[in-house]
Design a protein with these regions (language model features):
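N-terminal, non-catalytic alpha-helical interaction modules of very large eukaryotic scaffold proteins
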Residues: 58-61, 73
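An active-site-proximal "capping" alpha-helix that borders the catalytic cofactor pocket
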Residues: 67-84
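Acidic/His-rich, divalent-metal-binding segments that scaffold phosphate/diphosphate chemistry
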Residues: 1-57, 64
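Divalent metal-dependent phosphate-bond-processing catalytic cores, especially two-metal-ion Mg2+/Mn2+ enzymes
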Residues: 5, 9-16, 20-21, 79-91, ...
Length: 231
């Protein structure tokens, strides 16, 4: 389910919210500069509260354009559509797996990875929302959810592990469109816009730290597997 929903919203490419889900995203007004803001969360809005907690977003903040905005909005759509059909534990898992697909994140100042930090937030939400949780069950749940989340995140960026240059380029070429909205206008963008997009891609790939591409948690995948993917 997380794989199906994690790219439902892509504001830059779509020029806003997709029409089929626009009614589910009324909590995000635009500032005059076009940025999106998370409104105050109603106490009875379980789906939005869960997404904000898992993504560590706060009411009133501007959603970060390149650090989880589209993943967060996609998670909100998923949570609102699925909340009446999934258990709380499964809903937490879906939102957490979508959060894990935010790419290219470094360790924080304390040396914690994105999956380490996500695990703490998942554990907190599971303990708060699942009344019969006991410590051993909670840790087993967290380990499974974050391992699954890391697996999904790694599949999402699997093109970076291709050893064949042609396969690598065909897999990563989509990033040019994703990070350069003008190119979404087929036949309209200029040569200058195309050149700028190519140069951005060159700079991005040249500066990307391989250690920030693939994720792991609780030795899944193993250190050796991650090293092989990043080689």
């Amino acid at each position: 389910l997380a794989a199906l929903f994690h790219d439902v919203v892509y504001v830059q490419l779509d020029g806003g919210f997709p029409l089929p889900v626009i009614d589910l995203l009324q909590d995000f007004p635009r500032n005059p500069d076009g940025s999106l803001v998370l409104r105050e969360i109603r106490p009875d809005d379980r789906a939005l509260s869960l997404c904000a907690a898992i993504f560590e977003f706060k009411a009133g903040q501007v959603l970060p354009l390149y650090d989880g905005m589209n993943e967060f909005l996609s998670a909100v759509v998923a949570a609102r559509l699925l909340q009446d059909h999934l258990s709380t534990a499964d809903l937490i898992a879906v939102v957490a797996c979508i959060e894990a697909t935010i790419p290219f994140r470094a360790q924080d100042a304390q040396g914690c990875s994105a999956t380490d930090r996500l695990a703490e937030r998942v554990k907190k939400q599971f303990n708060m929302l699942v009344s019969d949780a006991d410590p051993s069950r909670t840790q087993a749940y967290v380990n499974q959810v974050i391992s699954d989340a890391a697996c999904l995140a790694n599949r999402d960026v699997s093109g970076f592990a291709k050893t064949d240059p042609g396969l690598f380029l065909s897999s990563t070429w989509l990033l040019i469109d994703e990070s350069n909205a003008p190119l979404a206008r087929a036949g309209v963008y200029s040569m200058r816009e195309y050149r700028i997009a190519l140069m951005r891609m060159v700079v991005f790939l040249a500066s990307l730290n391989p250690a920030h591409i693939f994720q792991h948690y609780n030795a899944k995948p193993s250190v050796q597997e991650v090293a092989s993917l990043s080689a």
